[in-house]
Design a protein with these regions (language model features):
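Extracytoplasmic/periplasmic solute-binding protein
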Residues: 194-245
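Glycine-centered hinge/linker elements that transmit conformational signals in sensory
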Residues: 242-273
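A structural signal for short loop-to-beta-strand junctions that line the ligand-binding cleft
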Residues: 112, 120, 145-178, 207-211, ...
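Hinge/lid segment of periplasmic solute-binding proteins
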Residues: 124-171, 185, 194, 221, ...
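Extracytoplasmic/periplasmic substrate-recognition and gating elements
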Residues: 87-88, 93, 182, 266, ...
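Conserved C-terminal helix/tail region of periplasmic/extracytoplasmic solute-binding proteins
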Residues: 180, 204, 380-382, 396-450
Length: 450
């Protein structure tokens, strides 16, 4: 992945695009010069072609689309994705298969790859592209890839194997009424954040932070992203892959995890943080929950849970030590639509991917999900609920998250390094120092075993 180029593009798309109180996404193209010279009419023309550029075929086809995001699935149902595409391509039927979460999705893909039965459409995470590269069809020729700001930045050996759907930031979602009840202000530092949790907890009426720790993944804003934020290094996993003992006390990972441990020691997740999954606790945001840490993808769930949406506020996770420090926040490019190279419906799949990025459908979907556009010159206004975080921190530094290169993945597999599971263990009371000591030993051994 071309990290430097990606960071330059994201800076243009996020930092520059906070205009007149709204974050306008997709306002930068490949370079500033190109952005200046590309007219809106050209963009509309390009996007209008998005569902038409794949090799046309009138042969009947049924394509299977595996979806793991509940929020995406809800949006597809509301927008009638299958029916909308059927109007454009009457000969192609789309069948959506919903799986529980990203973990189940990845496991299912591994099993089906071995059986040569991958689904036609797969919304992969960035790191999965390398894992499945030998099974994926190049998408360089489709219009969706050509109008995408970041598709080529994630190309492998010159091949675009997945077209990214969106980019998004991470937030702490909170109930304004609860903050008002306890006379609380939005925290600006990590210690202030923990203090807010303690105040709410002491009141005895609400759970300070909803977690759903029975599922491992919901702790990702803390256990996965905070080391990158502490280091101001979105490629921290790659950096760590070049170090024998990256878990020592003077390293960013340990420093970040010490902060996380301080939060977990405050026990802000209720009496049994590992006793319920995310789907169980997310509905409590409308009643017993004061805060929840999640990405922009949580917007639909937040609106479902809270009757009065004006009561929903957002702020960036305040990982900094003092108010004078610059705040770092994670930016993720996500949802890489891919199709198997040995699939029976490659052309139909390409037409469907193009449709997903067609102007009318894509614009509506981005608004519905509260996500940021990655289509060149297509501006989608951010939802006002999310805009609150940007207004409160206009100088926030966007840290572009990289899921890790092949060397990191090799070491990760050898050491069974799993940050989300570590989060569960920390909540359960496992010693941080012992975890770090053990990881240093296994990490060093894994690096030496090349």
């Amino acid at each position: 992945m071309k990290t430097n180029g990606l960071k330059r593009h994201l800076s243009m798309a996020l930092a520059v695009c906070i205009v007149s109180g709204s974050l306008l996404a997709g306002c930068g193209s490949k370079t500033e010069k190109a952005a200046a010279s590309t007219t809106a009419s050209a963009a509309v023309s390009s996007q209008a072609q998005a569902s038409e550029s794949a090799e046309p075929s009138d042969e009947p086809a049924t394509i299977k689309y595996m979806v793991f995001s509940t929020e995406a699935n809800d949006a597809y149902t509301k927008m009638d994705l299958a029916g909308s595409f059927k109007k454009v391509k009457p000969n192609i039927t789309v069948e959506i298969e919903k799986v529980k979460d990203s973990g189940e999705f990845e496991n299912a893909l591994k099993i089906r790859k071995a059986a040569n039965e991958l689904p036609d459409i797969m919304p992969m995470k960035a790191y999965m592209l390398a894992d499945f590269k030998d099974a994926l069809a190049p998408l360089n020729d489709i219009e969706a890839a050509k109008i995408n700001m970041y598709a080529d930045e994630f190309a492998i050996d010159g091949n675009i194997l997945g077209v990214p759907e969106c980019m998004f930031n991470e937030f702490v979602w909170y109930k304004k009424s609860i903050f008002k009840e306890y006379n609380l202000q939005v925290p600006k530092t990590w210690d202030e954040f923990i203090s807010v949790c303690n105040t709410i907890k002491a009141g005895g009426k609400y759970i300070p932070i909803l977690m759903g720790g029975k599922d491992a993944w919901p702790d990702y804003p803390f256990n996965e992203y905070m080391p990158a934020l502490e280091a101001n290094d979105g490629a921290i996993w790659n950096t760590m892959a070049g170090i024998d003992e990256p878990f020592s006390k003077d390293k960013p990972f340990y420093i970040a995890y010490s902060k996380i441990q301080k939060l977990y020691d405050a026990k802000p997740f209720g009496s049994d943080p590992l006793g319920a999954g995310f789907d169980q606790v997310k509905t409590m945001f409308g009643s017993k929950g004061a805060m929840i840490a999640a990405g922009a993808w949580f917007l639909g769930d937040a609106k479902k849970a809270v009757a009065d949406t004006s009561d929903i506020g957002t702020f960036f996770l305040p990982v900094k030590n003092t108010t004078g420090d610059k705040l770092n926040t994670i930016t993720t490019v996500d949802g890489f639509f891919a199709t198997p190279k040995d699939g029976k419906n490659i052309e139909a799949s390409k037409e469907f991917i193009n449709f997903l990025f067609s102007k009318d459908f894509y614009s509506q979907y981005m608004k519905e999900r509260g996500l940021v556009s990655v289509v060149k010159d297509l501006k989608v206004e951010l939802d006002p609920i999310l805009q609150q975080a940007y207004d409160a921190e206009p100088d926030v530094n966007f840290v572009v998250y990289d899921g890790g290169n092949t060397e990191f993945q090799r070491i990760q597999a050898a050491t069974k390094f799993d940050v989300k599971k570590m989060g569960q263990e920390m909540m359960a009371g496992k010693s941080l120092d012992k975890m770090m000591e053990s990881l240093n030993k296994s990490w060093k051994a894994a690096r030496a075993s090349k």
